[in-house]
Amino acid sequence: MSKMKMLPVQLSLNSLNPGIWSDVLWRCPPAPSSQLAELKTQLPPSLPSDPRLWSREDVLVFLRFCVREFDLPKLDFDLFQMNGKALCLLTRADFGHRCPGAGDVLHNVLQMLIIESHMMQWHLPNSPVTPTSRYPLSPHSHPPTPTWPPLNAPPENSPFHSSAHSLAGHHFMAPNSVTLSPPPSVDSQASSPPQAPYQNGGATGAAPGSAGGSAPAAGGATNTSNPTSSSASSTGSNGSQPNIMPMKGISSASSNHSDSEEEYSETSGGVSKMPPAPLSYSTASPPGTPILKDIKPNWTQQLTNSFVNSWSQQQQQQQQQQAAAVAAVAAQAQQHQLQQQQQQQQLPQKLTLDNTAGPVVTPAGGSISAPTTPSYMYKAKREFFPENSEPNTNGRLLWDFLQQLLNDRNQKYSDLIAWKCRDTGVFKIVDPAGLAKLWGIQKNHLSMNYDKMSRALRYYYRVNILRKVQGERHCYQFLRNPTELKNIKNISLLRQSTPANGNGGSPSMPQGSSQAPGSPAGQNWNPQQQSQQQQQSPQRPASRNGPMSLPAVAAVAAAAAAAYGPPPTSPLFMHAINGAFHYLSAAAAGPPPNSPALNTPSAVGGPDKFQFHPLKLENGSGSGSESAGEDLKPTDLSVSSKSTATSNEDCYPLIRNADGLTTIKLIRYNEHQVAASPAGQSPKHDDQQAGASNASSSPRPMDQASEQAQPVPMESDCNGGESEDSFRHMQQ
């Protein structure tokens, strides 16, 4: 690796061997010379540290300072109507022509300031410089930095300068670190060839040296792709070694540079981006800048010759590297494209799942990683999903994946999953292991099994997307329409929307042909749906005993009261009796008691027909019992003659869970019915209605037992032909 030439710095205190001079200077830089230190302290503070950033006013300030400081003859300031960039382009002869007798002094002072600014930026990129007007910390505090040649660029009077100084600006604006981009996806690999990151050695590369000596390279990774570019590090008092990584791979001489440039290298594989070099200084090491004490004339000529030679060699090497990089990138891209085409031809055949087949293996012996781009998965998607699947789903969610398998027009996956009742959304997983394997391929998770997939199914229980059908293995039911699920951005919002849907009631079913059990939508009861829901509903399983008529239930209750005495006034006892009453008479009633807001025709119902209203929970949330499991959802057993609950209705705040507690609304009769009741009862009534259609009034809570000793529960849908005396026997 070629050594980068460094400007010679003369040590005033030590006369060392020139061979080891650069190493000693690098490891322990001397203090700045007194002449330059005095010059820096005397300079006006308004002048930027880099003379190339000076404006016209700054140039005039500098000239006036030199005239005053060095007692020079008067200058013709009209000959220096230029900015700092143009002033730095003037040679010694130009200064001598414009101001005879003072041109050499002005040229030498200007060169000292230029070299000092170079040293600050090359050797101390991470030095904590005090933020002054000469060393601004913010890149926005001074004009934009022009593209300028580095130390190894030809000087201003060199013929190479006009055509190559913009290219060299990349080395001058070298950043200090390399930022790695995220791992490449299939999209980036398929659309663009792979590109290698810039190598950042652990220990830094070459150290700067004098014109006659060479700098030793510290231990570290050697970058063979660009011999002229090197890394440099300066060790401060804290021992840190900041890295300097010059940018390479410059393809054009334009001054408009992108924020990041990438180049392919054979020595590394990956993607990296070089951030733009900020004109700021971070805290890494204290400033210790080796500065020229004075410049000898013969050194100036040596520097010019070395700059020109190194620049020409660097340009040739960069052109060769660019040609090699372009050829390598083209070959790599062509090879990658061929591999991609082969994989596209082989993948659809292998993605067709066979239940008896082993793990899907690529020709190279590795596992298939499921494609993630639509263009890469286009053929395989036709094997998985129906052609009329809705956009923006792609089966990436489990419920959508199951829907697309179930709705396949050719029923190719009926041996894995099949509908049991499409109208109500009930389906069965025929082959759990095969379905989990197919889901693992879809999710690029080849170790997927049914136990892992069932976790997602159990999560769907909590958000009311699915529920498990009791009495049959691997049988589930959709509780929400796919269109509704696709319109929900965040699936966790389903927990919040559950109380608004009737507290446990489920919305419309897929296909929209029928309603789910417990649906809040108004729908006439059907005897077939009654028997079906008694088989499927986990909230109210059907009784295995034969149905009992209401008179028989009343007789059993009266016999129990006669045998064991009058029932106690405990609220828990009353609710246990009422819950048993409703549970035993569930088969005799028309609709199941867990169907809220069910509308029955007035022509069939008569005055004794009642309707459900939404359940009132103690905590006001419909998800209070969801954590207990799917069998612990609340059941609505309250009845009312109105379709919606009024504000003055009281409901016992109990939920039918595994404990057997239920929420029951108490009904009182009209005055002509209470007159026939036992004399021991004197219930307090609200405003009564004259019509027979309004058969209930506001209930009383259990803590007011003195006013209403034993309220009478009513079944949700009593037949008009049955006598009401059977209910009164329960009070005796």
From Swiss-Prot:
Expressed in R7 and cone cells of the eye. Its main location: nucleus. GO terms for molecular function: DNA binding; DNA-binding transcription factor activity, RNA polymerase II-specific; DNA-binding transcription repressor activity, RNA polymerase II-specific; protein domain specific binding; RNA polymerase II cis-regulatory region sequence-specific DNA binding; RNA polymerase II transcription regulatory region sequence-specific DNA binding. It comes from the Eukaryota. SMART domains: ETS (SM00413), SAM_PNT (SM00251). Residues 141-157 have a biased composition (Pro residues). Residues 205-240, 506-539 have a biased composition (Low complexity). InterPro entries: Ets_dom, ETS_fam, Pointed_dom, SAM/pointed_sf, WH-like_DNA-bd_sf, WH_DNA-bd_sf. Ets-related protein that functions as a negative regulator of photoreceptor development acting antagonistically to pnt and the proneural signal mediated by RAS. It acts upstream of SINA to inhibit R7 development. This is Ets DNA-binding protein pokkuri. It comes from Drosophila melanogaster (Fruit fly). The gene is aop.
